[in-house]
């Protein structure tokens, strides 16, 4: 296999012939990300890592999930506050967050799953889970709604503030809910 030289510059190869003769591939330098940029990163666990690295380098990143007040006696949101792993692994779940933000759909009050309690071990054995966000769980429908609203507020604030949107995708199966045609977030 022939060696290819990669060159970052302000000007791309004007012709394919130039690449063939020089074996140099010139890629443009995009200067979209600046120290004062506001970046919204959503998607797979890679988006979590990107948010962490950008924040370490002084970039203002959104959503600011770690700012969500957590009450583990009432609800759980991912692994917050230790890790901001609010992940969305497929395009349907990500699209639904943007649709929710733009008012295209609103989650119904009774749109949740009753699941076996493996979090608090309550006497009734059930807790309530948001089908559209991974590991958002409440002890009651009311505490689940509070958790859903807190995640929505953080997500919406990020969408309003951001200048750059970065979306990452995971590789996962997609589950469409029969009752309303929406897609669950694993």
Task: Say what each PLM segment does.
Residues 1-186:
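Extracellular glycan-modifying ectodomains
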């Amino acid at each position: 296999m022939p060696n290819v030289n990669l060159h970052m510059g302000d000007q791309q190869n004007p012709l394919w012939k130039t690449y063939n003769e020089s074996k140099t591939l010139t890629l443009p330098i995009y200067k979209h990300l600046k120290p004062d940029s506001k970046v919204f990163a959503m998607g797979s666990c890679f988006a979590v890592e990107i948010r962490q690295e950008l924040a370490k380098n002084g970039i203002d990143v959104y959503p600011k999930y770690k700012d969500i007040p957590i009450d583990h006696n009432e609800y759980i949101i991912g692994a917050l506050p230790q890790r901001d792993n609010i992940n969305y692994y497929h395009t349907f779940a990500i699209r639904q967050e943007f649709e929710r933000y733009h008012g295209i759909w609103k989650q119904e009050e009774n749109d949740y799953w009753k699941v076996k309690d493996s979090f608090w071990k309550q006497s009734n054995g059930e807790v309530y889970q948001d089908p559209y966000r991974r590991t958002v769980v409440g002890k009651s429908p009311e505490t689940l709604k509070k958790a859903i609203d807190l995640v929505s507020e953080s997500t919406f604030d990020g969408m309003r503030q951001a200048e750059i949107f970065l979306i990452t995708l995971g590789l996962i199966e997609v589950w469409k809910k029969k009752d309303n045609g929406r897609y669950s977030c694993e």
